[in-house]
């Protein structure tokens, strides 16, 4: 069979936007840095792309400039001590202290006390810069001077066309602004934290062009990464030179270290890059411009780059305070050339999927989602930290990341034959392993217990949910196993063996023996978080039981491959996990009353789907449970990753028609916008676990898994309506 024409597949899904779509800005990025742009190709009109604050604070925007290294903390209030949030919970082996918090109202945690709120909100991810177009001041404007510029209003926005060329990673925007036609080209260097912008004024319009860079303070808001109300809490300093300048950013004044966090010394973290420099600089921007461009500071936190001609070229290199700026000449053409070289190589690597021959009317949309999800996860889920749920679009949960979602963001990289993109974030676990081991030790367990919601320092966040989750724990083993299968097995086992070992030690120790086998909880909240109020008595959710059994088996095989003797306890626990409760012929969600609440994630069936087959779950009972979910579930309460999870279950059960139906089910939270993002709600307008989950499901459905019977593309119907050409997938376990 001929190789897939990958360029044709990708170019079928070039993103074209006419006018303002307030939910669907475009992005450029490289995994470490990303820029979201409006219809002007920059961030001229952030108010047209709003994101409300769940607590009722100032509205944020989808137009963020975010990185993996840009973090900030406001000064710590008295009493903000994580140990003070620990509460005793009864367990089968006695009292154990857990980080805890009062119940929350959805994402609104504003009612918490100041100390607890600080621990939840710091460090938070920064919006590094707001980069937007200015327009020339008319000569007849009151007080106007030749060469002056002003911010345009949305009323001055005319016709516009915008294209995201996925093959080159470049956004081209043609827009009429204040009566002048402009062409704006935007790109990000694939290997450096460097943005490039070229603005060209149409020959028929008066000359003169300018770009403004504005800098906010860090924000403790749940979704708004920029605080524009505290200009006195930070400093912006411009130093000019021929052909550009440098902007130094100091947060919380110049007297002490700026609050860009993430390195050794931040509550015990080690090895995570991103510390403030010794000079108190939080981060810096190196500006490269045309020789005739003017660069000036026009306000306390504003810098303007302008030219009296028709072309403005601007390169913005960003770096944390302790890091050097980009060495050597970097030009707009250089960045565009680097992007045009990188992205065809990206698309040519790993796996590809071509559904063009299918007659099912949904095939084109599935292929579109798969192509755009590859781009979106590459530019914001392939960095040095586990991603936040909104990637690098803007903040959710203040930019902090959730380890139970790491698998959903990034497992697909290995399954699609790009394991190096997953490996970038795996090193973070090494950095915070001492803290994870300390948590386990404090609770009386062996090994390392991985937290739920964290910043780069790995410190837990007080919550009535997060500290009681367990299903993030096996993810480390699962991700490492996917890397082993996709790459050099011996190297991967040597590299990640200690992480797998410490993860498994906790898993084997936290499981408690009972009359029917080894069980989990209490306290415990399953992946289906509907049982938060019952955490002090929840036991034995089916997904977690199956995941425990499978992951401990994988860890044991790793020990043997490493030359170590098997760990008897791991076999005893893994093979002896209690079977989950069955009621009325289906699996109950938990082992105690009320047994099953029919909201949130229907995770009772994910232990055969996300997780390979084990002896813990009976496929016939999983099938019956899936049927009951289909018949009666509160679908609006599900999340974007539930649909690929359900599709994986249907696939492993041998029901490909249902798998496709579930993957593309028409539900509000399974919407993929024109830009490819999986929208959930107004304040969660991008949701990368949905994109990564879709790619993981497609990999299973197309590439198959061990012991799948050998049928090609086993997750797609074999009725002639789906013609699934694929290459390069790594079979799932």
Please report, for each region that a protein language model flagged, where it lies by residue.
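Acidic/polar, glycine-enriched structural segments that form the non-catalytic walls/loops
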Residues: 1-262, 271-399, 419, 429-435, ...
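Beta-rich accessory regions
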Residues: 2, 177-223, 229-235, 240-246, ...
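Beta-strand segments within the central parallel beta-sheet cores of soluble alpha/beta enzyme folds
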Residues: 8, 211, 424-427, 441, ...
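Active-site core of glycosidic bond-cleaving carbohydrate-active enzymes
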Residues: 43, 48, 402-435, 455-459, ...
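Catalytic cores of secreted or luminal carbohydrate-active enzymes
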Residues: 113-143, 147-152, 689-729
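Short coil/turn segments at secondary-structure boundaries
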Residues: 343-358, 384-392, 423-427, 440-445, ...
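Glycine- and aromatic-rich loop/turn segments at beta-sheet edges
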Residues: 383-396, 437-452, 459, 509-525, ...
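Acidic/histidine-rich catalytic neighborhood
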Residues: 502-558
């Amino acid at each position: 069979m001929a190789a897939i024409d990958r360029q044709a597949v990708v170019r079928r899904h070039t993103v074209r936007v006419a006018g303002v779509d307030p939910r669907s800005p475009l992005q450029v990025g490289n995994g470490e840095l990303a820029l979201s742009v409006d219809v002007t190709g920059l961030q001229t009109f952030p108010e047209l792309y709003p994101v409300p604050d769940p607590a009722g604070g100032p509205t944020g925007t989808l137009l963020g400039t975010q990185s993996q290294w840009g973090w900030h903390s406001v000064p710590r209030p008295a009493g903000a001590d994580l140990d003070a949030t620990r509460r005793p919970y009864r367990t089968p082996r006695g009292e154990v202290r857990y980080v805890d918090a009062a119940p929350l109202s959805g994402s609104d945690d504003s009612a918490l006390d100041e100390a607890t709120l600080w621990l939840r909100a710091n460090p938070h991810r920064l919006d590094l810069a707001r980069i937007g177009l200015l327009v020339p001041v008319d000569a007849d404007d009151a007080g106007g001077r030749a060469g002056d510029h002003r911010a345009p209003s949305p009323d001055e926005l005319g016709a516009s066309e915008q294209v995201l060329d996925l093959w080159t990673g470049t956004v081209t925007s043609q827009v009429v602004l204040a009566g002048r036609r402009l062409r704006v080209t935007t790109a990000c260097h694939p290997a450096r934290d460097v943005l490039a912008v070229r603005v060209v004024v149409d020959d028929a319009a008066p000359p003169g062009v300018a770009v403004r860079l504005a800098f906010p303070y860090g924000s403790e808001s749940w979704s708004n990464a920029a605080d524009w109300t505290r200009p006195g809490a930070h400093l912006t300093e411009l130093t000019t030179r021929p052909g550009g300048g440098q902007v130094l950013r100091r947060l919380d004044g110049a007297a002490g270290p700026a609050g860009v966090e993430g390195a050794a010394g931040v509550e015990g973290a080690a090895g995570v890059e991103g510390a403030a420099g010794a000079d108190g600089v939080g981060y810096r921007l190196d500006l490269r411009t045309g020789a005739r461009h003017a660069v000036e500071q026009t306000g306390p936190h504003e810098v303007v780059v302008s030219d009296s001609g028709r072309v403005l070229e601007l390169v913005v290199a960003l770096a944390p305070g302790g890091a050097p700026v980009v060495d050597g000449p970097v030009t707009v053409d250089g960045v565009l050339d680097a992007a045009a070289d990188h992205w065809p190589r990206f698309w040519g690597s790993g796996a590809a999927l071509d559904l063009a021959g299918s007659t099912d009317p949904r095939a084109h949309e599935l292929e579109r989602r798969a192509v755009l999800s590859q781009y979106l996860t590459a530019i914001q889920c392939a960095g040095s930290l586990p991603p936040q749920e909104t990637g690098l679009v803007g903040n959710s949960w203040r930019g902090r990341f959730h380890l139970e979602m790491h698998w959903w963001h990034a497992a697909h990289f290995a399954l699609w034959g790009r394991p190096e993109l997953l490996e970038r974030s795996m090193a973070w676990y090494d950095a915070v392993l001492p803290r994870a081991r300390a948590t386990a030790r404090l609770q009386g367990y062996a090994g390392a217990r991985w937290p739920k919601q964290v910043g780069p320092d790995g410190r837990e966040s007080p919550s009535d949910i997060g500290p009681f989750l367990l299903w993030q724990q096996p993810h480390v083993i699962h991700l490492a196993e996917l890397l082993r299968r996709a790459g050099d097995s011996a190297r991967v086992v040597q590299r990640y063996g200690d992480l797998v070992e410490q993860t498994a030690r906790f898993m084997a120790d936290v499981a408690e023996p009972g009359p029917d086998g080894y069980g989990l909880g209490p306290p415990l909240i399953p992946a289906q978080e509907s049982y938060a109020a019952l955490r002090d008595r929840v036991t034995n959710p089916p997904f977690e039981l199956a995941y425990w059994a499978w992951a401990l088996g994988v860890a044991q095989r790793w020990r043997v491959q490493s030359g170590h003797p098997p760990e008897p306890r791991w076999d005893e626990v893994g093979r002896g996990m209690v079977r989950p409760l069955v009621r009325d012929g289906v699996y109950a969600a938990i082992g105690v009353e009320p047994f099953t609440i029919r909201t949130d994630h229907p995770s009772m069936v994910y232990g055969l789907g996300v997780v390979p087959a084990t002896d813990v779950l009976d496929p016939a009972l999983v099938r019956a449970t899936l049927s009951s979910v289909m018949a009666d579930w509160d679908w609006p309460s599900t999340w974007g990753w539930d649909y690929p999870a359900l599709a994986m279950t249907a696939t492993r059960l041998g029901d490909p028609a249902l798998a496709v139906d579930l993957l593309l089910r028409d539900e509000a939270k399974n919407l993929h916008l024109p830009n490819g993002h999986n929208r959930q709600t107004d304040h969660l307008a991008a949701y990368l676990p949905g994109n990564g989950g879709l790619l993981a499901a497609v990999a299973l459905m197309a590439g198959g898994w061990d012991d799948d019977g050998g049928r090609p593309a086993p997750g797609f119907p074999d009725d002639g309506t789906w013609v699934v050409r694929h290459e390069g997938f790594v079979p799932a376990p």
